[in-house]
């Protein structure tokens, strides 16, 4: 059975690299890259979906695409890149909690 993989944080270097590599994996049928801004680099044949993991809509994406694997790369290590510590915590903590909740509710993950 081939996998459908969702990769978060594809606009950042590491997330984009993971998405691009997964598109070359023969065991993976479909790769969906998610971020709030389009990636400035190639993500291979991965499909880009503009979405914020802090938004409950992420659950709909998991369900509609029948995602069975999630690779969470949407973490900000430097507060300056997020606009300060508060937005950094919101993205890292609230976003991760929302994504994990969506995974838990999903029938396919």
Language-model features: locations:
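Rossmann-fold cofactor-recognition segment
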Residues: 43-56
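NAD(P)H-binding glycine-rich loop region in Rossmannoid oxidoreductase-like domains
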Residues: 53-91
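Local beta-strand N-terminus motif with an aromatic residue
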Residues: 2, 66-67, 109
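Conserved glycine-rich Rossmann-like NAD(P)H-binding loop of the short-chain dehydrogenase/reductase
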Residues: 27-38
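Conserved cofactor-binding/catalytic machinery of classical short-chain dehydrogenase/reductase
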Residues: 69, 95-98
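Conserved Rossmann-fold NAD(P)-dependent oxidoreductase catalytic core, especially the SDR/UDP-sugar
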Residues: 97-109
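N-terminal Rossmann NAD(P)H-binding glycine-rich loop of SDR-like oxidoreductase domains
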Residues: 2-27
């Amino acid at each position: 059975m081939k996998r459908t993989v969702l990769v978060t944080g594809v606009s950042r270097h590491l997330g984009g690299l993971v998405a691009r590599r997964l598109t070359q994996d023969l065991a993976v049928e479909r790769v969906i890259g998610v971020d709030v801004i389009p990636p400035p680099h190639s993500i291979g044949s991965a499909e880009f979906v503009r979405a914020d993991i802090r938004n409950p809509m992420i659950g709909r994406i998991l369900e509609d695409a029948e995602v069975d694997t999630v690779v969470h790369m949407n973490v900000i290590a430097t507060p300056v890149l997020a606009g300060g510590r508060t937005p950094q915590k919101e993205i890292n903590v609230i976003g991760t909690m929302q994504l994990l909740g969506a995974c838990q509710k999903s029938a396919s993950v």
